[in-house]
Amino acid sequence: MADRTESSIVIDAPPGEVLDVIADFEAYPEWAGEVKDVSVLAEEGDGWADQVQFTLDAGAIKDTYVLDYEWDVVEDGTGVISWSLVSAQVLKAMNGSYTLASDGGGTKVTYRLAVDVKIPMIGLLKRKAEKVIVDTALKELKKCVEA
């Protein structure tokens, strides 16, 4: 599963504010249109979510799944938040990351995502679904943070 989708956007807010929105998983259904429900199942000792369950409806991909998160961020909010799939019904793999970098007074957010499903699906459709998820997530994140 070497293929992945990547896109970036600049958000008019410091990295710490962007990180706060990304880390507030239970608020995702309020701003991330394809996310219907979220539950934090476990937290790391430092308070970051470790395992999170999502219910997703992204058109071609509908599933309830659990992701395991790694937080490689510094105090100002810059760094990488990455995740990998723990369990799912439809998804076979969902690995991705947000990279937050200072960009003047704002934050450059790069979202990388690779998805694979258990049911047969043409690679082109998988990449299209990834692109829709990535582009929509970045636009919705920007809108939420800048509101």
Predicted feature residues:
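Amphipathic alpha-helical hairpins
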Residues: 9, 90-93, 132
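A short acidic/glycine-rich loop-to-helix N-cap element
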Residues: 114-136
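Hydrophobic ligand-binding cavity/cleft-lining segments
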Residues: 1-47, 140
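Short amphipathic alpha-helical signal-transduction/dimerization elements
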Residues: 26, 130, 134, 138-146
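Hydrophobic-ligand binding "helix-grip"
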Residues: 29-33, 37-44, 55-106, 114-116, ...
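Short, well-structured hydrophobic secondary-structure segments
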Residues: 50-52
